[in-house]
């Protein structure tokens, strides 16, 4: 099992990131997640806590999947006026796990929508752990109804 220094999960959140209030009760329970939105730059991140880890002391794949499923549509909300207020339920989510994210690591991701149609969003992103690529994600999302304000902000 990997052991991080005792203060690893209390390391400061990188400058510019603020707590994410969107996502509903599930993500509030499993987070906290943070967002940085400065101009065209949109990043999401979180610090790997003990409750996020697998028996090897690394980020559990299920938590990575949860993060990716938040990262991609919420990035699209902030980058596209076309769907900024719409609920984007996941149709398909593909994740390639590239490397482990150890306890205490800062996990950060960015995503882009290469294509938006009248009913679907196609998007992709990259996730890093302390700057090292750890996951590649792509997804297809349905353009749903107008979302409650606290679901997308």
Predicted regions, residues:
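Terminal targeting signals and extreme-terminal segments of soluble enzymes
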Residues: 1-153
């Amino acid at each position: 099992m990997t052991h991080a220094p005792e203060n690893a999960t209390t390391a400061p959140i990188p400058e510019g990131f603020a707590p994410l209030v969107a996502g509903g009760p599930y993500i509030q329970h499993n987070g906290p997640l943070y967002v940085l939105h400065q101009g065209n730059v949109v990043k999401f991140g979180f610090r790997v806590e003990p409750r996020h880890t697998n028996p090897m002391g690394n980020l559990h794949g299920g938590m990575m999947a949860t993060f990716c499923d938040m990262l991609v549509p919420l990035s699209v909300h902030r980058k596209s006026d076309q769907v900024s207020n719409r609920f984007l339920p996941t149709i398909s989510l593909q994740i390639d796990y590239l490397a482990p994210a150890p306890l205490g690591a800062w996990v950060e991701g960015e995503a882009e929508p290469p294509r938006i149609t009248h009913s679907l969003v196609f998007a992709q992103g990259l996730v890093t752990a302390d700057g090292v690529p750890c996951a590649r994600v792509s997804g297809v999302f349905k353009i749903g109804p107008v979302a409650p304000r606290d679901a997308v902000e």
